[in-house]
Regions:
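Thiamine diphosphate
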Residues: 1-92, 97, 105-108, 114
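Short, intrinsically disordered, charge-balanced linker/junction segments flanking boundaries
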Residues: 113-119
Length: 119
């Protein structure tokens, strides 16, 4: 696993390790491996990255591993390079078996991410 790692303050009694990966597909594979090793794991991605993570989402959901994927849902890149909100990428993940929580503000994301880890 290649990436830059740093240590951060404690979250749920554990030190937080942050790893920045070079691609979303690699990040999803690292999330799967981290979950399989028993670590509390989350990742942050945008619409295009989520589509690259779908194969690993099937594996994570099939093994019932507790991951949290924070997704910034925006329109997929096109010739117009749209920056408007769109949920087509998230809807493409419905059949993976992952539970989805949808927030409408940054504050809700901050409030519900720990809740998602606890559930």
């Amino acid at each position: 696993m290649s990436g830059q790692q740093t240590e951060e303050p404690i979250f749920f009694g554990h030190e937080v390790q942050i790893t920045e990966m070079q691609s979303e597909a690699g990040a999803a594979g690292a999330v799967h491996g981290s979950l399989a090793a028993g670590a509390l794991t989350t990742t942050y991605t945008a619409s295009q990255g989520l589509l690259l993570m779908i194969p690993n989402l099937y594996k994570i959901a099939g093994e019932q591993l507790p991951a949290v994927f924070n997704v910034s849902a925006r329109a997929l890149a096109s010739h117009a390079l749209s920056i408007f909100g769109d949920h087509s990428d998230v809807m493409a993940c419905r059949q993976t078996g992952c539970a989805m929580l949808c927030e409408s503000s940054v504050q809700e994301v901050m409030d519900l991410t720990p809740v998602a880890h606890l559930s």
